[in-house]
């Protein structure tokens, strides 16, 4: 069964491109274009991992990630952003960071790295 990702980004072009790329990599993908919609999807669906853009109108990704970690601490969250320096506070509760300027495959690789131990634990 494919792992389910929640991808959150207010940049609709990047949202579409990454949705397609992640599906091509074999993941089931839920998408949201803002923090409020993301938290609703997160509360209503099983999610193996969330990818959250940092800068979004209304609610930045750090607050979205913190709320996700509060609701379900075991779900990994990756910040995907053009911001190269994140506050230590943000780094303390997220599971990874990938720059939007990186090749899209960098995000796919980071997701795989984080989920691999979880796959092994489920299989064993």
Task: List each language-model region with its residue ranges.
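Conserved acidic segment of CheY-like receiver
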Residues: 2-13, 18-22, 50
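Output/docking surface of receiver
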Residues: 93-114
């Amino acid at each position: 069964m494919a792992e389910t990702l929640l991808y959150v980004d207010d940049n609709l072009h990047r949202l579409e491109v990454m949705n397609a790329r992640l599906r091509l990599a074999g993941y089931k993908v839920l998408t949201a274009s803002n923090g409020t919609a993301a938290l609703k999807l997160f509360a209503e669906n099983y999610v193996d991992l969330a990818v959250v853009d940092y800068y979004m109108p209304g609610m930045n990704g750090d607050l979205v990630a913190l709320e996700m970690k509060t609701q379900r601490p075991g779900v990994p969250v990756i910040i995907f952003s053009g911001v190269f320096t994140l506050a230590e506070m943000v780094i303390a509760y997220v599971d990874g960071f990938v720059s939007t300027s990186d090749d899209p495959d960098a995000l796919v690789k980071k997701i795989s790295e984080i989920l691999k131990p979880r796959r092994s634990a489920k299989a064993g």
